[in-house]
Curated annotation (Swiss-Prot):
Transmembrane segments: none
Oligomeric and partner information: Homodimer.
The protein, known as: Lysine--tRNA ligase
GO BP annotations listed: lysyl-tRNA aminoacylation
Length: 500
């Protein structure tokens, strides 16, 4: 047992003893629930922070505050609530028995304080502790003030402690809530209807990914946590709801990285009588408006860069982007779509770039890998990448002028994908053929290929109007708005391996 653990165990034992000493003197409960707060810290600061000491004395304003003790310096306590911090003073006018009990208070305890509001000589508001009540005794100590909670893994495993002691973490999740609310309000103003579709699917679909598998006991059948809501949302468009959106969780049984968590949040939406160009325009409007609403500017810092959401955003085909970011590669500079269709050419090109290829990869998959390795990470400013091959876009409508590619885009900021959208494939026969090609790919070893969904084909046979749809990764978007570089910093409880 380390010295640090021994010290912590000693503190826990001391705090338990303090709680045990309190219990016999409590007529009802050592964890009372009768205290009522009248003001939060920020409310008092906003309303009375500009008053002079004399004005507050004359006002004689009495208040009740509640929160967690974050510091204890002689007769002064620093109390933190959801809105901020305020001090309490346990000296002037405090009853003798309360002073005695004051000595038993520890940093981390949750208390309620009632008394008159004053201004200290340093200009800080404080509440004189005429009355106080211990509401919850903290049995474990908080991390030391100057060392803090710096271990990243502990921050993720014990997010509750992280939120108590790290203002930056609290503000990141406040911003996350604001981003989601702003997106929801924007979509509702654009006459989209918010819906909820199943989280457990009989057939996983809507994206190329490995699903999580579970078992439905009552039906005695396997089911899958959804990898995307797409096929259900498009069924709703078939049913006549012309504009729908959903903000919810998706689950993909894949690896962990600074950009990936198996459980993540998406906003997915569909609009009838629109195409992928309309989606790009709407995305520009959405992101620029929420940036200005939440940050007061369309520009925001991200690492060493300044990201400009003001628009218009760059629009490049995947082939154009590869050529732009490989200016010294003569083969790439001369490459045409006819060559992209040549499997051997694409394999040789990928290998020459140091890419480890899979034998079942198609021309489109090879093009996407080349893009990902050489161009994607350089897309710092908002950029739409178009021209995705049909063989990696099984749900997207083919381009009218070039049937090898689809009317699809992915949206990149800060060197990572944030959104994916396209004009929807509403040709039931073409969709049937592409599902069958996905089944063949799965049989060849691609475990991320899609399943065949016969009911979705039936839905398309009833008629899906011309439609465009898009998914936006909420977690990655929040990373931008909070200037953080790992997805775990914007997910309250990220996936972690259990501790031994």
């Amino acid at each position: 047992m380390t010295e640090q653990v021994q010290d912590e165990n000693k503190l826990i034992a001391e705090r338990r003893a303090k709680l045990d000493s309190i219990r016999p003197n409590c007529s009802a409960n050592a964890h009372p629930n009768t205290f009522r707060r009248t003001h939060k810290a920020a409310e008092l600061q906003e309303k009375y922070g500009q008053n002079t000491k004399e004005e507050l004395e004359a006002l004689g304003f009495r208040t009740s505050i509640a929160g967690r003790i974050m510091a204890k310096r002689g007769p002064f306590l620093v109390i933190q609530d959801v809105s901020g911090r305020i001090q309490a003073y346990a000296e002037k006018g405090v009853q003798a028995d309360l002073k005695d009990r004051y000595q038993g208070l520890d940093i981390g305890d949750i208390i309620g304080v009632t008394g008159q509001l004053h201004l200290s000589g340093k200009g800080d508001l404080y509440v004189n502790m005429e009355e106080y009540q211990l509401l919850t005794k903290a049995l474990r100590p908080l991390p030391e003030k100057f060392h803090g909670l710096t271990d990243q893994e502990t921050r993720y495993r014990q997010r509750y402690v992280d939120l108590i002691v790290n203002e930056e973490s609290r503000q990141a999740f406040v911003m996350r809530s604001k981003v989601v609310a702003a997106i929801r309000n924007f979509m509702i103003k654009k006459e989209f209807m918010e819906v909820e579709t199943p989280m457990m699917h009989v057939i996983p679909g809507g994206a190329s990914a490995r699903p999580f598998i579970t078992h439905h006991n009552a039906l005695d059948m396997p089911m899958y946590l959804r990898i995307a809501p797409e096929l259900y949302l498009k069924r709703l468009v078939v049913g006549g709801f012309e504009r729908v959106f959903e903000i919810n969780r998706n689950f993909r049984n894949e690896g962990l990285s600074p950009r990936h968590n198996p459980e993540f949040t998406m906003m997915e939406f569909y609009m009838a009588y629109a195409d992928y160009q309309d989606l790009m325009d709407l995305t520009e409007e959405l992101l620029s408006s929420i940036a200005i609403e939440l940050l007061g500017s369309a520009q925001m810092p991200y690492g060493e860069h300044t990201v400009d959401f003001g628009g218009p955003y760059a629009r490049l085909s995947m082939l154009e982007a590869i050529q732009k970011y490989n200016p010294d590669n003569a083969t790439i500079q001369a490459m045409t779509y006819e060559q992209v269709k040549d499997l051997e050419f694409m394999r040789e090109l990928a290998i020459s770039l140091g890419i480890k290829i899979e034998k079942f990869w198609t021309c489109g998959q090879l093009l996407e890998e080349i893009f990902g390795e050489t161009a994607e990470w350089q897309l710092m400013q908002p950029t739409f990448i178009t021209g995705y091959p049909a063989d990696i876009s099984p749900l997207a409508r083919r381009n009218d002028d070039n049937h090898f590619i689809t009317d699809r885009f992915e949206f990149f900021i800060g060197g990572r994908e944030v959104a994916n959208g396209f004009s929807e494939l509403n040709d039931a026969q073409d969709q049937d053929s592409r599902f069958k090609a996905q089944v063949d790919a799965k049989d060849a070893g691609d475990d991320e290929a899609m399943f065949y969904d016969a009911d979705y084909i039936t839905a398309l046979e009833h008629g899906l109007p011309p439609t465009a749809g898009q998914g936006i990764g909420i977690d990655r978007l929040v990373m931008l708005f909070t200037n953080t570089h790992t997805i775990r910093d914007v997910i309250l409880f990220p996936a972690m391996r259990p501790q031994a």
